[in-house]
């Protein structure tokens, strides 16, 4: 059962999830609302470069056409005049966009009969006055409204603000005094606020404070990013509170703002869930995967683009499970399909043995009535096969084992050196990621001669070491002055080896290499229980007496909410291909799947925003914890980065001459 179906129990049948609300606003509040006064049966929808992405992340073209849109146009392209049709403009409220709009609708013969204008974020008064000043344009406007929806709904529980360069603009060596710093944060704040405008939610705003060690330590702009962003979001919310009808006047949810410095490991380490591995190891463009299918002519193969999205039930089931678990489930699905289908059995008997991906694809032609079912099964069998081959070819089990041993303190410098000496055929990219994990745990060791020797031993270039060196930009201050503990990546001086994760009681590894968890998961649980460290996390607004953000006592006392305790590794107990009975919450067989529509109502929503890019492991944690905590958890970020993207961005933090294209790894 999906989160969307489970959360409908929160407040009855009218409850809608984050993505559903976003979609409904675009289709019904914007497109459908124009039908009341428009005499045009079909309309033109005009969008700019940003709003077309906003729309595409939430709606299909068929959805848009169903609301009376026959043509979608680019605001910046030369367009054919359609003076007998009405137009819907969904655009950002910029001077250039408004200039183009007014040019379209002014003069004796405008491009369109009537215009319905919807701005994605608040529009400046002077720009509205400019529109109203032109009597010809004013007479042709059917609606002029602020949609306040300026974010990408990338997932049923995730969004980004489309700030792909946030890491560079906010954390680079040149961020201090840069005009881009304030511009980036201001726009980010506005877009985050539009999430709450869409959801009609008013949050209690928590944020990570600057990590000042003592009065002599200079607080940098990097350290102040969460504080400044929290203030910016609050200012926007204050405006919405006064201007938007039915906007809550008291707190209805919680928002936590952090930055990428809380966890430098999560964007680098190899994740073993199906979704994370697809985006890490396969050459995908966003969610697009290129599948090889039999050509229509019958000879050879051809490429077919497919989207790994929510409409695919197999993807929904597998995306957050371990790759070994996913492979087992796919094998079971194939076996079940064949056992229940006589035609498939005959096809298998003719070919002999198990069905391969190609044989499944041929079966689509032989059994057209099952084409959709077999198509999706063949797709994921092919993907899982590629992933397992890559894992074997790149020796990723060995790489992943050392990564996690370093993180949990079961390995150190000696083991890393030995690995580099004995695994000479490991790829440069994987050696770099190993060294970056080591650097996050032992920052001082990689800045000394030892770091240069490790680089030489691993066969890394000076260009690779830029990424390792630039991790210091996310540390805030000199790690030598850091105190141990907390959520920051400071090594613990009390340990012989510097493990920066604790094993958690009650969450024993179900699969080999599944011990790792992002720090954000721990933070969300602490926030839900009201246990965020007060010296590290402040809030802007005191909660009103009616605020019910903290879950009920019954939730707090459940075994799943016991505090984490340090313990030795149980890594030898994990298994690559055989599950244990423990439930880690990631599986579709978790509590989420078995929650009935009559279950206890969910608590208030919890939003988390990560400045500088979120990871797929963090998005996975949002889904997992929504089930565990009985609250819809929505993860937002400036971008969603896979390891190669993050490493490329890290390299940009200390250079002026290189571009992203120059530094792709």
From Swiss-Prot:
SUPFAM superfamilies: Sec1/munc18-like (SM) proteins. GO terms for molecular function: syntaxin binding. One of its GO terms (cellular component) is secretory granule. Keywords: Protein transport, Transport. Pfam families: Sec1. The keyword Cell cycle does not apply. Coiled coil: none annotated. Residues 552-567, 585-594 have a biased composition (Polar residues). Signal peptide: none annotated. Residues 543-594 are annotated as: Disordered. GO terms for biological process: intracellular protein transport; vesicle docking involved in exocytosis; vesicle-mediated transport. Involved in the vesicle trafficking. Binds syntaxins. Belongs to the STXBP/unc-18/SEC1 family. This is Probable protein transport Sec1a. It comes from Oryza sativa subsp. japonica. The lineage of its organism: Eukaryota, Viridiplantae, Streptophyta, Embryophyta, Tracheophyta.
């Amino acid at each position: 059962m999906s989160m969307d179906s489970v959360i409908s129990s929160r407040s009855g049948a009218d409850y809608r999830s984050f993505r559903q609300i976003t979609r409904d606003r675009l289709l019904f509040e914007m497109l459908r609302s124009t039908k009341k006064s428009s005499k045009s049966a079909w309309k033109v929808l005009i969008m700019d470069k940003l709003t077309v992405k906003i729309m595409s992340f939430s709606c299909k073209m068929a959805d848009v056409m169903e609301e009376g849109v026959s043509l979608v146009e680019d605001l910046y392209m030369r367009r054919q005049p359609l003076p007998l049709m009405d137009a819907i403009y969904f655009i950002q409220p910029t001077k250039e966009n408004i200039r183009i709009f007014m040019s379209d609708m002014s003069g004796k013969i405008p491009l369109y009969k009537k215009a319905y204008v919807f701005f994605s974020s608040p529009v400046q008064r002077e720009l509205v006055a400019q529109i109203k000043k032109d009597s010809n344009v004013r007479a042709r406007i059917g609606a002029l409204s602020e949609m306040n929806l300026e974010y990408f709904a990338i997932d049923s529980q995730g969004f980004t603000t489309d700030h792909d360069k946030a890491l560079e603009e906010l954390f680079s060596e040149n961020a201090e005094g840069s005009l881009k710093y304030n511009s980036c944060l201001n726009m980010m704040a506005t877009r985050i606020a539009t999430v709450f405008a869409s959801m009609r939610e008013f949050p209690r705003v928590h944020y990570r404070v600057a990590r000042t060690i003592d009065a002599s330590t200079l607080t940098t702009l990097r350290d102040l990013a969460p504080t400044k962003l929290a203030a910016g979001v609050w200012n926007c919310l204050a405006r919405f509170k006064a201007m938007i009808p039915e906007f809550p006047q008291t707190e209805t949810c919680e928002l936590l703002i952090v930055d990428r410095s809380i966890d430098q490991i999560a964007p680098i380490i190899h994740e073993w869930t199906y979704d994370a591995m697809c985006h890490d190891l396969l050459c995908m463009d966003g969610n697009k995967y290129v599948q090889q299918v039999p050509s229509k002519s019958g000879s050879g193969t051809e490429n077919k683009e497919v989207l790994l999205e929510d409409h695919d039930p197999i993807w929904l089931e597998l995306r957050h499970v371990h790759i070994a678990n996913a492979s087992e489930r796919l094998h079971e699905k194939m076996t079940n399909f064949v056992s229940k289908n006589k035609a498939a059995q005959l096809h298998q008997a003719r070919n002999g043995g198990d069905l391969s991906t190609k044989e499944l694809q041929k079966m689509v032609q032989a059994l057209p009535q099952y084409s959709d079912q077999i198509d999706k099964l063949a797709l994921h069998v092919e993907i899982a096969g590629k992933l397992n081959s890559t894992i074997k070819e790149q020796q990723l089990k060995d790489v992943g084992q050392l990564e996690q041993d370093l993180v949990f303190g079961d390995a150190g410098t000696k083991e890393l050196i030995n690995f580099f000496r004995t695994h000479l055929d490991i790829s440069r990219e994987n050696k770099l990621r190993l060294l970056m994990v080591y650097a996050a745990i032992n920052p001082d060791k990689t800045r000394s001669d030892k770091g240069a020797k490790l680089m030489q031993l691993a066969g890394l270039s000076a260009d690779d070491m830029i990424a390792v060196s630039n991790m210091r930009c996310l540390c805030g201050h000199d790690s030598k002055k850091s105190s141990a503990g907390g959520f920051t990546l400071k090594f613990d001086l009390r340990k012989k080896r510097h493990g920066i994760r604790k094993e958690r009681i009650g969450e024993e590894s179900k699969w080999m290499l599944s011990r790792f968890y992002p720090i954000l998961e721990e933070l969300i649980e602490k926030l839900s229980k009201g246990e965020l460290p007060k010296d590290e996390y402040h809030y802007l607004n005191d909660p009103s007496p009616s605020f019910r953000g903290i879950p009920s006592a019954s939730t707090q006392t459940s075994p799943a909410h016991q505090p984490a305790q340090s313990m030795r590794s149980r890594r030898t107990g994990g298994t690559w291909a055989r599950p244990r009975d423990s439930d880690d919450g990631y599986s579709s067989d978790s509590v989420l799947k078995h929650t009935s529509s009559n279950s206890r109502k969910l608590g208030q929503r919890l939003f988390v925003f990560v400045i500088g890019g979120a990871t797929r492991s963090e998005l996975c944690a949002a889904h997992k914890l929504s089930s565990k905590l009985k609250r819809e958890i929505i993860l937002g970020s400036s971008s969603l980065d896979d390891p190669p993207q993050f490493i490329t961005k890290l390299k940009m933090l200390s250079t002026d001459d290189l571009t992203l294209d120059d530094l792709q790894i």
